[in-house]
């Protein structure tokens, strides 16, 4: 859906503007938060009273009676003109108060109900929306250890949010006056830029709850190594060490291709209710947006469908769970063709080792072309796309890198998977220059060098410790040196 910005009034073309920087909260922010909290508690008390009264209409009538504003019917045939006039005045007062009480009842209802989540989002408030459910939903939820959350109010309480705040975070607008995310770009190896979209603190805290209590409890395939406890770029690389052929395939637009509807489907299959799945899928996704000025107002305009943001804590875990079937199919394909398969986020790696093949296959060449053709078929069938420019085939005798580590067969004392030599040489040269009092490269800091040393330590602890010790010594020397006046 494309939003329409008042076409009846001529205006200048929208101008793209940078996302504004966050400003520090004002001194009375705490007082405003407390006032909002008290107002919300009052709404919850009112909502409870309405439920106990039997509904909004019964509560309104009871309030009118308690205030002495409920007016009984009048027999106009026997009433005097004076009584008629007085009765009409009372009815006006009753009607005015009834409208005010109905507004109050609606405010209380909004504090405990979602109601609407924006254009293109189906939302059913009642709990009967699961009448046509996925098979064995309750059993799936129990098997995955998922908490049964049967209402928006229960979910909001678990997240530490009010229902109105939950609705605000989940509500989808094509054009919005505010955004729950902060975006910036970082350079990629090929010179292009990657956009990072990170949620603001309160939404990030809610997403972390979703990650811990929902996403991380969903099943993940053993071939997945990224963002999985106990696995890393090292475990991913070690699966391919000493191979004769390494094939790397990259998935294009990995996070943006996972829309909120795909996330909802994943959560439904995991055992969550319809409403809970809808709210959590919207809470974990956002549309890519561009900030524009329109008639003096800053607007955030959606440029595409709502999908996983690269920068949200939930995104990697959701893709791991969503790729369960993809990983199963690619693992089976790899096994049939004699390959080993692993996945680290959007990086798919296959390796073929002659020594691991059955004797009849050892004289055959690895079926790389067949593998690549069928990988593309499986990837597309599972809703993803292969990046046409990032497929690499590295044979024995050329440098084979997997998730940044070299996995070629190495000497007796060398790690099976190791940091490339040029990185080690770069760190060694940087330390040498600093010891000689020479300035580092532009933008180079001790913290960055320590990060490189820690990277080396992961694959070669002895070498990494030696580099870290030298950097610690340099840091101590720098802090002890007299500061120039």
UniProtKB/Swiss-Prot annotation:
Q: What is its EC number?
A: 2.7.7.49
* GO biological process assignments: defense response to virus
Question: Per the record, what are the reactions this protein catalyses?
Answer: DNA(n) + a 2'-deoxyribonucleoside 5'-triphosphate = DNA(n+1) + diphosphate
Keyword tags: Antiviral defense, Magnesium, Metal-binding, Nucleotidyltransferase, RNA-directed DNA polymerase, Transferase, Transposable element
Q: Where is the Reverse transcriptase domain?
A: 167-407
Q: Kindly indicate whether the keyword Metal-binding belongs to this entry.
A: yes
* Protein family (similarity comment): Belongs to the bacterial reverse transcriptase family.
UniProt miscellaneous comment: M.xanthus contains two independent and unlinked retrons: Mx65 and Mx162. Retrons may be the ancestors of retrovirus.
What task does this protein carry out? Answer: Reverse transcriptase (RT) responsible for synthesis of msDNA-Mx162 (a branched molecule with RNA linked by a 2',5'-phosphodiester bond to ssDNA). The retron transcript serves as primer (from a conserved internal G residue) and template for the reaction, and codes for the RT. The retron is involved in antiviral defense.
What is the name listed in the Swiss-Prot or TrEMBL entry for this protein? Retron Mx162 reverse transcriptase
